[in-house]
Amino acid sequence: MPRAHLAAAAALALAVACKEPTVPHPLANQFRYTCCNLHYEKPEITDANYLRGTLIPFGTRIQILEVRKDSVTFKAAGHPPITLTLRDGARSLTLDQYLDRVFPPDDPYARLPKLPPDGKQAAEVDKTRRMIEEGTVSVGMTRDQVLMALGYPPADRTPSLDASTWRYWASRGDTFEISFEGDQVSRVSRQPAAPGSGRRGRRG
């Protein structure tokens, strides 16, 4: 065999030998739950977690279809496949850490406050439950209840969940803050951004 053919055959054999099979992510094809209310306008969203568009309620059972280097594609009944990309918080969290947050193995509905026997207290608890389901927050709610209602604040703006203030994006260029005293919400303040200060011109 000519030397050129031998070299080509050797190169091909080496390429085949070096190509490793793709190993699926451990979460691929698993069923999980949404930690919180998630929103989308298009089937591609990011951890910017804009609070607008179609709602996927917290506690929705989802199937994880595919996990890539910095994104996950999942499917909830009645919704198209959604690709969620870890973008802004990538310096603070690994993708696996982020997935553990947003897609827990257990239904978060079990963490909703239970209705007490007292009628007045039951009315207050029921109001809180409805606000969580509607994705709204009020003074007196706990950090865990805020997470269920709004989702996790983008990690680039709120690196630690122990912080006294969490910052969210209602939409691109429109932020608001949740302030806490201890474990409870003490204030909700809206902070529209100055003109031209929107988030990098991309939608999440």
Task: Cite the ranges covered by each PLM segment.
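C-terminal motif of bacterial Sec signal peptides marking the signal peptidase cleavage site
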Residues: A15-A17
